Amino acid sequence: MTNSNLRTENHFDYVKITLASPERVMSWGQRTLPNGQVVGEVTKPETINYRTLKPEMDGLFCEKIFGPSKDWECHCGKYKRVRHRGIVCERCGVEVTESRVRRHRMGFINLAAPVSHVWYLKGIPSYVAILLDMPLRDVEQIVYFNCYVVLDEGDHKDLKYKQLLTEDEWLEVEDEIYAEDSTIENEPVVGIGAEALKQLLEDLDLQEVAEQLREEITGSKGQKRAKLIKRLRVIDNFIATNARPEWMVLNAIPVIPPDLRPMVQLDGGRFATSDLNDLYRRVINRNNRLARLQEILAPEIIVRNEKRMLQEAVDALVDNGRRGRTVVGANNRALKSLSDIIEGKQGRFRQNLLGKRVDYSGRSVIVVGPKLKMHQCGLPKEMAIELFQPFVIHRLIRQNIVNNIKAAKKLIQRADDEVMQVLQEVIEGHPILLNRAPTLHRLGIQAFEPKLVAGRAIQLHPLVCPAFNADFDGDQMAVHVPLAIEAQTEARMLMLASNNILSPATGEPIVTPSQDMVLGSYYLTALQPDAVKPDFGDQSKTFAGLEDVIHAFEDKRINLHDWVWVRFNGEVEDDDELTSPLDTQILEDGTQIQQWTYRRDRLDEEGALISRFLLTTVGRVVMNNTIIDAVASG
C-alpha cells in the first residue's frame, strides 16, 4: 500500500479557533525537503510562465513550495513516474509526489515590516483598542502613519506614555531634546505604525492588568464599570487561550494552497484566476519594494509610505473594503478577499461545511394537504422511489420479482405497478424527516408518515405550518430518510408532528389554526341574514340525521347556508337559549312537545327525551359531523 492509500483516522474532541503565533504561521508554510533544503517562503509575485505555462519558481504557484502540478513529475521533467516517489530533483528542487498535495501545502510571505490584523483593529468591538484602553481613532492614527505614539516618556516632563504626537509636535520635542541647553539625559522614545502598536501590546502584562481591573471594578459603577468589565473579559480570554496580544500584529502571512485559488486557461488562451492571487501579488510586490528601499537606506518618508501601502495591501487580502478604498479588479468589481470567502450565506462555512448535500435526502416545494392527518405528509412518488430505492431493490430481490440489482433498477425506471406496490410496503411505517430552513428551534425538523401522492410537490398539513414558520407561497422543504432502527424509533417517538403540540420555548400550543382554516370555519358556520327559516315538517328542509343533511348538500338539493331541521338526540348547549320553552304542547298519548328558539323536543310523561330536532344551518351540520368523526377516529 502506498502512503496515499493509507487511511489514518484522527479522533478529535473539538475544534478550537485561536490566535496563531508567528512561529505557528511559519511552521504551516515552512518545510524541510528530504535533501535538507528549507522551502516555503513565497518571494516572487509571478504565477505561471506565459510561454511554458509552468509555475514560476518561488512564485505563487511554485512547485518547490507547494508540490508538483502533475502527479509524480518534477518541474524540469527529469523525474517522471511513481517509481521516483520521494526523490527531490537536484536540478529544480521539486519533490516527486502526488499533485493533490497542492490542495493542502501552504507557503508564507515574510513581511519586511509588521502589519496589524484588520479583524482585530477594525472589528466591532476593536480588540486592539480595548486592550490598549485607547480610542479606536487614535490606534488607527498610529497604524496608518498619521501620528507618533510615546513608548517611553524618558525625562521629558510634558510627555505621557501612549500620548499621540503629530509630525510637527514630535519635531518640536526633538528640538528641545537636542538643544544645547537641554537637561534631558534619558531621551523619550516614540514609534509609529504597526511596529509601535506591537511594542505597546508587548509591554502589556496581562496578569497584572487583570488584577488592577478587578480592584477598580469593585469601586466603580455605571458606564465606567461596564467599560472595565468589557476590557477584563478580553484580557481573561487572552490568558485562558495562552495567546499573546502582540500576535494581533503579523510578521508573516500564510499563503493558502494554490489549488484552493486556482488559475485556469479559457478557450481563447486567456486565463481566469482567483481574486486571491491578485491580492497576494499586491502584498508581495509592496513587500519586495519595501525590503529594497530599506536595503538602500531610502529616506524615512518614502519607507513609511511603503509600509502604509503594505498595511493596506494586507488589509485588502484579509478583508477587502473593511477599511479605506475597496480594491477592485476588471469591470470595477471588488476583489473577493479571505473574509468574503469565509463569511455569509455563500461562504465556506454555511455553503460548503454546514450546507453539504447528504445521501437519502431531497427537497421540493410544499403545498397544502387538507386531507392528510396531522402526522402525515404527502411524498411525491418520483421522490419516494429515489429516496427508498435501496429498500425497494432489496424487497424486489427478496420477493423473487427480480434476480439482481441491475434488473431491479430497470424495473424501477419503468415505474412498474409491482414497484409501486413494493414502494407502498416499504414506506409503510417508515417515518421521514421534514426540515425547513432556517431551523431556528427544534420544531424546524419534524417526523411524518409518508403518503404517496401524484405530482412533484410535498404535501403538508396546514396545522404544522406555524412550527416550521412555513406558508404555501413557494416555500421549499428538505426530506431526510432516517436509516438506522434507532433513528427511526427516535423519529417516531419524539419527532412525530402529532407529539409536538406545545412550543418548547413558551409551553403554549404551537399547533393553532390560522388563515384559511379560521376563515373556512367562519364561512362554514356563518349565518346568512336573509335566509328564511323553514317550518318544522317542511319535507325539503327536515332530515332524520346529520348524514342525510350532508348527502342532500352533496346532491346540491340544499345550499351551505340554508336553515334545516335535523334530528339529533345528543346534548345541545346554547348560551342564547331561553330558560323556558316558547311553547309547550301536550299530545293525546301524554307526550309533550316543547318548542324552543332553535330546537323542538318531544318528551314522554316522565319528561325523558324521546326525540329532538334542531334548527341549524347545513354548514354547522358539516362542521359538527366532522368534529364527531375526528374524535371517534382519534
Swiss-Prot record:
Zn(2+) binds at C74, C76, C89, C92. The keyword Transmembrane helix does not apply. It comes from Prochlorococcus marinus (strain SARG / CCMP1375 / SS120). SUPFAM superfamilies: beta and beta-prime subunits of DNA dependent RNA-polymerase. InterPro entries: DNA-dir_RpoC1_gamma, DNA-dir_RpoC_beta_prime, RNA_pol_asu, RNA_pol_N, RNA_pol_Rpb1_1, RNA_pol_Rpb1_3, RNA_pol_Rpb1_3_sf, RNA_pol_Rpb1_clamp_domain. It catalyses: RNA(n) + a ribonucleoside 5'-triphosphate = RNA(n+1) + diphosphate. Binds 1 Mg(2+) ion per subunit. GO terms for cellular component: DNA-directed RNA polymerase complex. Its EC number is 2.7.7.6. GO terms for molecular function: DNA binding; DNA-directed RNA polymerase activity; magnesium ion binding; zinc ion binding. The gene is rpoC1. This is DNA-directed RNA polymerase subunit gamma.
